[in-house]
Amino acid sequence: MSSLEVVDGCPYGYRPYPDSGTNALNPCFISVISAWQAVFFLLIGSYQLWKLYKNNKVPPRFKNFPTLPSKINSRHLTHLTNVCFQSTLIICELALVSQSSDRVYPFILKKALYLNLLFNLGISLPTQYLAYFKSTFSMGNQLFYYMFQILLQLFLILQRYYHGSSNERLTVISGQTAMILEVLLLFNSVAIFIYDLCIFEPINELSEYYKKNGWYPPVHVLSYITFIWMNKLIVETYRNKKIKDPNQLPLPPVDLNIKSISKEFKANWELEKWLNRNSLWRAIWKSFGRTISVAMLYETTSDLLSVVQPQFLRIFIDGLNPETSSKYPPLNGVFIALTLFVISVVSVFLTNQFYIGIFEAGLGIRGSLASLVYQKSLRLTLAERNEKSTGDILNLMSVDVLRIQRFFENAQTIIGAPIQIIVVLTSLYWLLGKAVIGGLVTMAIMMPINAFLSRKVKKLSKTQMKYKDMRIKTITELLNAIKSIKLYAWEEPMMARLNHVRNDMELKNFRKIGIVSNLIYFAWNCVPLMVTCSTFGLFSLFSDSPLSPAIVFPSLSLFNILNSAIYSVPSMINTIIETSVSMERLKSFLLSDEIDDSFIERIDPSADERALPAIEMNNITFLWKSKEVLTSSQSGDNLRTDEESIIGSSQIALKNIDHFEAKRGDLVCVVGRVGAGKSTFLKAILGQLPCMSGSRDSIPPKLIIRSSSVAYCSQESWIMNASVRENILFGHKFDQDYYDLTIKACQLLPDLKILPDGDETLVGEKGISLSGGQKARLSLARAVYSRADIYLLDDILSAVDAEVSKNIIEYVLIGKTALLKNKTIILTTNTVSILKHSQMIYALENGEIVEQGNYEDVMNRKNNTSKLKKLLEEFDSPIDNGNESDVQTEHRSESEVDEPLQLKVTESETEDEVVTESELELIKANSRRASLATLRPRPFVGAQLDSVKKTAQKAEKTEVGRVKTKIYLAYIKACGVLGVVLFFLFMILTRVFDLAENFWLKYWSESNEKNGSNERVWMFVGVYSLIGVASAAFNNLRSIMMLLYCSIRGSKKLHESMAKSVIRSPMTFFETTPVGRIINRFSSDMDAVDSNLQYIFSFFFKSILTYLVTVILVGYNMPWFLVFNMFLVVIYIYYQTFYIVLSRELKRLISISYSPIMSLMSESLNGYSIIDAYDHFERFIYLNYEKIQYNVDFVFNFRSTNRWLSVRLQTIGATIVLATAILALATMNTKRQLSSGMVGLLMSYSLEVTGSLTWIVRTTVTIETNIVSVERIVEYCELPPEAQSINPEKRPDENWPSKGGIEFKNYSTKYRENLDPVLNNINVKIEPCEKVGIVGRTGAGKSTLSLALFRILEPTEGKIIIDGIDISDIGLFDLRSHLAIIPQDAQAFEGTVKTNLDPFNRYSEDELKRAVEQAHLKPHLEKMLHSKPRGDDSNEEDGNVNDILDVKINENGSNLSVGQRQLLCLARALLNRSKILVLDEATASVDMETDKIIQDTIRREFKDRTILTIAHRIDTVLDSDKIIVLDQGSVREFDSPSKLLSDKTSIFYSLCEKGGYLK
């Protein structure tokens, strides 16, 4: 066809160019493009218009077609006018075309104009009108249509400017008028586009409607894909240098509402369990598969586009070849360059949409799994809780859940990498033909090698997670028992134990993983080289065509994509392995045995049923593990004998509980010696133990609870890290009157007066700032305030002194005015005074009820074999006889339940207050409902800390501004400077040899092109292979240096330093810092240092080097590129400057918002039995949702900020591709014209720049954010320490103290600087070997005195002198290791009895056994020796135990009762040869008989030592040489008991009189 042959009125037909010599587009081709784009937008616009019309998320009056309001926004009216004006201009163009006499215009032009007119009038105008009333954002089809119009009109104007005067046929419409119309269309399109992009605002009524409903208004598509919606936050944060209000951040999409997605995920998981498939993978896919699929579709499209790019590169290089360049005009090269640019930009948008979508899915998965783990942890049986330590469960949250999140966030690599490999190989086949088969064979050979190595990594990864669990468990236990560790001076063995797990197990295994991973990495790193060599070599040998630059460099681009895909395979394999291990661990946990209280028949009693017992138990045996687990292989026919043989006595918690009743309004007491099963009995009533039939097989087990509410007080008080008031309310509505009654009755008023902030005092983790008695009464107050029907109270009187005990009995339990007088109470106790007023007493022995009866009946029994009578006689003591006479009680009977109730609580310092029954019922009406305040979204934790309070919890420290240089230097120092230098050296050498590879390919291909054939193939392939092997070798050395030398060394040093710093911190640090926050440093932050930083730094420096090599290479050959690059660098720095401030602040918020999740988990695990008893699961689950939601909100904003920068910088990268191509075109036909080989090389590198900039952005951010983990670790490495452990200049003698004399001189101390003194001006001198009793009301400062002696508290003034030495002058280790103590909170550690008694290995086995026997612990250990630990199914380990010293102790001594743990502490004291022994309520949790035996042992074994005895039961110190009476931190009296008792005005006399000791 000739150039002037007319087709359908088109002089040049429909081809893109008129001819090869004309550097312009064919006007008819332009018209075709215009017509088709109009058709496309008509279709899309019609759909969007219909969707907009049907939108009902608007005010009611806008739901139908809205009419114009009387006052319309003037800007929007102008905008509608612009749209009409656009249509008018098109009509004018139609008129010009139709009435032209000079030129006949083609039909396609008229069609294009009509279609565009139809779009403007039929779609654009009604859409713009409706959007004002029914949309919060401008429509996407409008934005893209007018963007296209701007580009089209601009091109038409430029083509007219260059060619219109010489050839009118090259203009779409001829004449000056047409030019004016094109200019007007351009400016009008710009005006419409800018309005839609930046100015559009809906009617105010619609905006208010969205705010009213709490909806986050969506944004238009360009804002969505370019993240313009983040601009406001980014600019504000940059100006303020911090985030002003974390609670005002943009909300994440509805799909990230943790509460709703967690419920959906839980439903899917429950369905999986019901179908017996138990697949977590399937449950996750059902819940998040759609989001993941959409995101993966974006990335797959982007991957396909990246493969298309090299094909256009081949066309571009061909166009620069003098032999082929004459076929097309130079404009063709420009369009090819623009096509490469557009592909890059579209790929950028798709990639970033993929990332934000997949991150959204990952966050949802993490939030759902974390919620499910939390909920499951609250439902575990006692046996499962013994097996799964707090550290194990916290590790699931902090490591496993995060790994699964990362796996799904990298899901595209797992699926995309294989797709990329297939598509790239297909493209290579198209370019190189059958030579690609050589590459396929090479890849196939490597598969089995890597499969073998991958299996090895999986095995090692399982071991790694096991060791990580052990470490976190060890740290958790260490933190929970930190006070005992300091008192015993056990820091050194505990650090050695932790370091053993960390260094000798975890890091040693991590090193093995690194070695195997590096082998995989090296193998895969060689694959691209071998594929390239084999492919190019075979092509050169067997192809007739020369291996020219037009083939080499497009192939090289494809090989780079292949290299990237293959490069990700090793990490992909590791990710899959680690995730599968984590998934199995999570699945195992989620399938664990959980509390099943369905066997309990709960009845809300009607009026007719109130005479029936509140609790009934018949023919029931309780187990540590469910019968289904223990007898899974047993048939149902062999019911008793086989069950007993399989279950065994060691798995029975309570045996044959029969005919147990607690009548409504009765006080029922349960008694028994240490380890009899009293606490277990209460937990059984709560349904926390599985059960089976008792001795009567034919009768099913029965447990009936006729009540709607139960309150429970555990023996070890569970106190939340909150204020006193919040602990008492426990989520219930605040009622001032009943609250006041509660704190008075529970004897808390005097404590509130001395607490720094009254009932707003924050008590710290586990109530660490309270005494044991205060914690017990606070726990009791929580139970009383709940106003339940049934109360289960576990030995609540053991931790309080006699007077407080008497008042609690009178005002809470059985007195005439007692708050619980008409309630059903089951109380485990050994206090006879309360037993005398109970309606029934049950005696437990070895988990079985052996006898029952009321006090009078039992004591009148003539039978000397009565075990219960014997127990009661043992328990009887002066304290009990005395209390009876002082407590004003009436016998609790059933008839009292319905009598009018009058509560009267008398306090000596206040007026009497009376609450009648009718008033009380009004209080009770809403009492059990959780307060709405506990279920409202609360401000982020960082905003909750009240700095005004003296006891305010220390907010987690967050640095402001850039991460300081010293943090980077600290990490480099930890890694080792030499290792870091070698790492950089090997990295630079790798890039040098990579560059040499490509230059050799350029030389090879140009040589072939010049000769027209493939010559010296073996020489070229050989040299190329050698260079490639050198590159791979140096790359592997870089990896080895980073992982095996730098990273592991740095991790080891940082962990050791942090652990040492934490364990050496004073107790004030632990009182003000939640355990969860500390654990977060050792888990999440340490995991980031272990696993993330090494890869991030490697990728960062690799990307930097790639970018620098590209800039230098392209700039050297095209000097103008350096000018252009400088401009791009300025833009890069501009965006990075804005971005870095917000990203850093968000990362810090992410870190500190994660700590409350861990703290709540840790706290809930410790108090799960309380949460279960009060049925507060839903409230705590809500709190967990709330804390996870805050974290997710911050993470989503952080990820969106990353995408904001990524879009901009990757677009800069795409611009570099365009600039390189345009500059290459500019050199054509000049002296500096580049060879096709050089152009191919430069374009190959410029195509890599987008990817390099992407990685620079990602890794810069990730380094800046992950280094925050190092910053947080370094912060803990620099904690203010206690005094030095050993003072070399003033070390006491080995036998110090040799006498045991103690003198307090004007001694005062306080817990923290901002608190009032707790001990004031103490002046006491204790002679050697004196036995001194320390008495006083709970909270008087008795335990504080012992803490002062051990320098847990340092003096604010004065001093303590022991045997002539000021204890402030010597080291803490020398002091504490030379004193002995039996602390109030008895602690046991996971390990054996031996390691619990003698961690330093100082004593012989005979000495240890003697101490165990003297502490009366031997019978309990022998019983444990001949049975497995509760819930322990292991056969091997426990089967080999044949010595009581080797009996296993569970985490926190969970397989010992509180009393048994106190006996263990006594054994420790017996081993210590110290001349000074402190007994801090040492026998509070043991029965009377055991107490007497222990007291006799202490008197006998410690007769030649100084003993300070802190006691609640004053009878235990009446035989002391001296008595110290403390009151509000001051010594009120100090003399012998006889002298103090002879003075009837003395405080001690008053205490004894009130306690009944004078009788």
Curated annotation (Swiss-Prot):
Taken from the record, one Pfam family name reads ABC_tran
Q: Which GO BP terms, alphabetically?
A: bilirubin transport; cadmium ion transport; transmembrane transport; vacuole fusion, non-autophagic
What UniProt keywords are attached to this protein's entry? Answer: ATP-binding, Glycoprotein, Membrane, Nucleotide-binding, Phosphoprotein, Repeat, Transmembrane, Transmembrane helix, Transport, Vacuole
Sites where the protein binds ATP 1: 672-679
Q: Which domain of life is it from?
A: Eukaryota
- Domain spans labelled ABC transporter: 639-871, 1302-1553
> Where does the sequence pass through the membrane?
30-50, 85-105, 111-127, 140-160, 179-199, 284-304, 334-354, 411-431, 435-455, 519-539, 561-581, 973-993, 1031-1052, 1096-1116, 1118-1138, 1210-1230, 1236-1256
Side of membrane Vacuolar, spans: 1-29, 106-110, 161-178, 305-333, 432-434, 540-560, 994-1030, 1117, 1231-1235
In Swiss-Prot or TrEMBL terms, this protein is called Bile pigment transporter 1
Record organism: Saccharomyces cerevisiae (strain ATCC 204508 / S288c) (Baker's yeast)
Its taxonomic placement starts with: Eukaryota, Fungi, Dikarya, Ascomycota, Saccharomycotina
